[in-house]
């Protein structure tokens, strides 16, 4: 997959003429890999939402939000936070995703 064009300041990527917030460049692979995996899995499941009930759809949408916040693509822009705040946010969103995974397994959903 090719690397998308970035704005001069590096804060945004350009895809099909649209500007999207870029992933936080300070995040290490140990954080980005599981966040990207969670994002991809949730999006894939949402693509089959006709097979899901409202609660399942809401849970998956929340997972997308948490993953994108962790990556710095949503929420407070990463360039407005300190590096420590950016890393803490990514770790927090990973923890939220992991807790939700445990609740889903325990609840049988």
Region locations from a protein language model:
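Extended, charge-rich alpha-helical interface modules
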Residues: 2-109
């Amino acid at each position: 997959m090719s690397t998308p064009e970035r704005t001069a300041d590096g804060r945004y990527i350009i895809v099909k003429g649209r500007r999207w917030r870029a992933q936080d460049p300070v995040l290490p692979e140990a954080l980005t890999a599981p966040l990207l995996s969670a994002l991809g899995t949730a999006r894939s499941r949402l693509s089959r939402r006709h097979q899901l009930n409202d609660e399942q759809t809401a849970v998956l949408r929340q997972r997308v939000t948490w993953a994108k916040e962790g990556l710095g693509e949503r929420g407070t822009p990463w360039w407005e936070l300190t590096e420590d705040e950016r890393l803490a946010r990514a770790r927090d969103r990973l923890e939220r995703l992991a807790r939700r995974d445990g609740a889903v397994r325990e609840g049988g959903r």
